[in-house]
C-alpha cells in the first residue's frame, strides 16, 4: 500500500456544511483504518474540538492521530501520548494582542476547558465556539491571563478586512511567527516554522516513512503546505483556488463525499 498516512483537514473537508461526517466517507475511512492506514485529523481546531470526531472514527482503536492547533500539537489517539508539541513564544503574546486591538480584530487562545478572550461576544469568537462546541471565558487582559504554555493565538475578524490584516501581520512578525488564514474570518498565528506540513514530516519520520507515503485532503489556505508535501495532495471541490492549483487530484466537495471518494480511489482501490 503506497499511502500509509492519511491527513485530513476537518472543516470544509472531512465534515460537510452541517459539520457532520457523511456515511460514505465514514465507511471509507474506517475500512482504510482497518487496513492499517494511520488517519490524522489535521486541523487548526484545539484538541478538544477534534476529539469527538476522533472518537466517532474510533481512532483510539486503530491508532490514528490528532494534529491540532494547525500543527502545534500531535497526539496518538491509542496511547494518549503527545508526539509533537510546539509552544507559542511567550514574549510575542503581548505584541500580537496589541497589534490585534489596533487593527480591530479579536485575538483568542484556549485553556483546558475552552476559549479565552477579551471579547467573548465577538461574532467570530462565537463561531469558533460553535465549531468546536466549547465554552468561552472572558478575561480583562489576555496576555496577563496566559501564564501557561499555548500552541497558537487565533485572530478573528470581518472577512473583508482579514486579507489586509494578514498582509500587515506577515510584515510585522516576519521571521518571528508562522501566519496564515484558515478561514475567511480566521488568522492562525503559530511558532515560527510550525504548520500542518512540518508536524506531519516529524510524524512521518517517526514512522520510518516519507512524504511519498502521505495522502492529504484539504480546502483552505492553511492546508496548502500539507497538500504540497504529500505524495498525493487532494483538493476538495470547494477548496480555495491556490489549493486546487497545487493538488495532484481534485475530488468532489465536502457535501458530496469528496474525502470518501478520494479514499476509495487511491487507498481502497489503490488507483494511481
Feature-to-residue mapping (PLM):
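Asp-based phosphoryl-transfer active-site loop
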Residues: 2-18
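Active-site phosphate-binding/coordination module
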Residues: 23-124
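Short active-site oxyanion
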Residues: 36-40, 64, 152, 212-213, ...
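Short, structured coil segments at secondary-structure junctions
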Residues: 57, 62, 70, 173-175, ...
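Conserved acidic, metal-coordinating active-site core of Asp-based
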Residues: 99, 103-217, 221, 229
Amino acid at each position: 500500500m503506497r499511502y500509509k498516512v492519511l491527513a485530513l483537514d476537518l472543516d470544509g473537508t472531512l465534515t460537510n456544511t452541517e459539520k457532520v461526517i457523511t456515511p460514505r466517507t465514514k465507511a471509507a475511512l474506517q475500512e482504510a483504518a482497518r487496513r492499517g492506514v494511520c488517519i490524522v485529523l489535521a486541523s487548526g481546531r484545539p484538541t478538544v474540538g477534534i476529539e469527538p470526531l476522533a472518537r466517532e472514527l474510533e481512532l483510539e482503536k486503530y491508532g490514528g492521530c490528532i494534529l491540532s492547533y494547525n500543527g502545534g500539537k500531535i497526539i496518538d489517539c491509542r496511547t494518549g501520548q503527545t508526539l509533537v508539541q510546539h509552544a507559542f513564544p511567550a514574549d510575542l503574546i503581548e505584541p500580537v494582542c496589541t497589534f490585534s486591538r489596533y487593527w480591530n480584530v479579536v485575538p483568542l487562545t484556549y485553556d483546558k476547558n475552552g476559549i479565552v478572550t477579551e471579547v467573548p461576544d465577538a461574532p467570530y469568537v462565537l463561531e469558533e465556539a460553535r465549531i468546536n462546541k466549547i465554552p468561552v471565558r472572558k478575561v480583562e487582559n489576555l496576555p496577563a491571563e496566559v501564564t501557561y504554555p499555548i500552541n497558537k493565538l487565533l485572530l478573528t475578524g470581518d472577512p473583508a478586512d482579514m486579507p489586509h490584516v494578514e498582509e500587515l501581520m506577515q510584515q510585522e512578525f516576519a521571521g518571528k511567527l508562522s501566519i496564515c488564514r484558515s478561514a475567511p474570518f480566521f488568522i492562525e498565528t503559530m511558532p515560527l516554522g510550525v504548520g500542518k506540513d512540518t508536524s506531519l514530516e516529524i510524524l512521518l519520520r517517526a514512522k520510518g516513512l516519507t512524504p511519498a507515503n502521505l495522502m492529504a485532503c484539504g480546502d483552505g489556505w492553511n492546508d496548502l503546505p500539507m497538500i504540497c508535501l504529500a505524495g498525493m495532495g487532494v483538493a476538495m471541490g470547494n477548496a480555495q483556488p491556490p489549493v486546487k492549483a497545487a493538488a495532484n487530484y481534485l475530488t468532489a466537495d465536502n457535501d458530496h463525499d469528496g474525502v470518501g471518494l478520494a479514499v476509495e480511489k487511491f487507498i481502497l482501490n489503490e488507483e494511481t
